[in-house]
Swiss-Prot record:
Lineage of producing organism: Eukaryota, Viridiplantae, Streptophyta, Embryophyta, Tracheophyta
Pfam families: UQ_con
Protein name: Constitutive photomorphogenesis protein 10
Domain of life per record: Eukaryota
Gene name linked to the record: COP10
Binding partners and assembly: Component of the CDD complex, at least composed of COP10, DET1 and DDB1A. Interacts with E3 ubiquitin ligase COP1. Interacts with E2 ubiquitin conjugating UBC5. Interacts with CSN3, CSN4 and CSN8 subunits of the COP9 complex.
Similarity section: Belongs to the ubiquitin-conjugating enzyme family.
Biological role: Component of light signal transduction machinery. Involved in repression of photomorphogenesis in darkness by participating in the CDD complex, a complex probably required to regulate the activity of ubiquitin conjugating enzymes (E2s). Repression of photomorphogenesis is probably mediated by ubiquitination and subsequent degradation of photomorphogenesis-promoting factors such as HY5, HYH and LAF1. Although strongly related to ubiquitin-conjugating enzyme, it has no catalytic activity by itself due to the absence of the conserved Cys active site at position 120.
GO biological process per UniProt: red, far-red light phototransduction; regulation of photomorphogenesis
CC annotations in GO: nucleus
Keywords, in A-Z order: Nucleus, Phytochrome signaling pathway, Ubl conjugation pathway
Domain UBC core residue range list: 36-182
Length: 182
């Protein structure tokens, strides 16, 4: 970009004044503005940093605002006690109108988490509302460590064991926690 110089010649503008500009007004807006979903995610990130839920943390992976990594510490008194569980959080471009996708990266023996790490919890499906936040989602996921939802399982075989032989279920869940989450 050029500006008129004192001698009638054009001189270049300082680079910082047009960083991100590629020649059209629309490209300037695309590179310098944050979408409504991005602003919402930034606000939730700030709130999460100020007041995180118990045993939970989360934040962007690198500089991608729409891809986060979360950590949940297994609550005491559960077969997951002391385990460190990592999750990927992917926010859709139309967040919060669509729920984020959460995937366990740490293997876990749980009826609401399938073998690929995908969760089967109502808050991320039928119960989703734009009023919910990532803090509420993390709290809901932590709550399934305390009280699994065996009647809406991702893995029915684990749900069946949970309902019919809780002691054996908890023994296997503890073994997995020691093996994969410590």
């Amino acid at each position: 970009m050029m500006t008129p110089g004192g001698s009638g010649r054009l001189r270049p503008l300082p680079t910082a004044m047009y960083a991100g500009y590629s020649g059209t007004a629309s490209s300037w807006v695309a590179k310098t503005s944050v979408s409504a979903s991005g602003k919402r995610i930034q606000r939730e990130m700030a709130e999460l940093n100020i007041d995180p839920p118990p045993d939970c943390s989360a934040g962007p992976k690198g500089d991608n605002l729409y891809h986060w990594i979360a950590t949940i510490i297994g609550p005491s008194g559960t077969p997951y006690e002391g385990g460190i569980f990592f999750l990927d959080i992917i926010f859709p471009s139309d967040y919060p109108f669509k729920p984020p996708k959460l995937v366990f990266k740490t293997r876990i023996y749980h009826c609401n988490v399938d073998t690929a790490g995908d969760l089967s919890v109502n808050i991320l499906r039928d119960s989703w509302s734009p009023a919910l936040t990532i803090t509420k989602v993390l709290q809901a996921i932590r709550s399934i460590f305390l009280k699994p939802e065996p009647y809406s399982p991702a893995l029915p075989v684990i749900a069946r064991l949970y309902l019919t032989d809780r002691e054996k279920h908890d023994e296997v869940a503890k073994e997995w926690t020691l093996r994969f989450a410590k």
